[in-house]
Amino acid sequence: VAECEVDDILAEVSGGEARWTPVAAGSTELAQIPQNWRPIASAATATERCRHALSLWGSDFMALLPRFTRRFQDELTDVRVFRRELGGLSEHVLIYVAGQARDGFPALWLGWDPAVLGQPEAEFFGCFPAAVQAFLRYVHPGFTAQDWQSYGIRRPDTWESLDGYDWFPRESFAAIRSEPSQLMWFTKDSGQLYYCVNSSLPSGRVTLAYEGSFDPPSDFAAELDELLRRRWDEQ
């Protein structure tokens, strides 16, 4: 893979005050990244990097999102390790390059290092299916597009309930027999469609929210599978 592709990635994720640095074979940074990421950073080819990265994903998580997984595997062209520095803090991120969206820009996903965030104990963690919980604990505690919010699952350290949000009138919560403190949005599309878990419901259910109203709860896996596949349809 040509080095210019690293520049393409940097063009997408750079901005603000954070500094992004690629970690590759021969880098003095190799000893600082997660041990199971070192084969990715050290690999000589993009094919090897992709293979090593996908080997970390659990089969249960892939089975939960079968259509996205197939498309992701087909589109995946490279995986790179980066160090992100801001305000004296440093963390490592895997960036997956999976083809292009309809707008012509790279379709990227950012996967965070579990060691940085530790074992998630967020309030809403138990709302997610077991396969997602395992993915968040052991693979990536946060897997999203480069906006850190959409087309995946936000980092657990950003989770908060809808209590205090002014997006939804009180009657919207009454319609689904829930309190704002029971809902948390964990991802969204490129617009204003939000995907929420609800602590009053069994795991495996998701509530979609748009323009101040909520849809009835639906199947978590089916809805997330469909959302992630729409990443390539962005304009």
Segments (PLM) and residue ranges:
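A recognition module on extended beta-rich or small alphabeta surfaces enriched in W/G with H and D/E
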Residues: 178-180, 186-235
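A surface-exposed partner-binding patch
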Residues: 1-193, 200
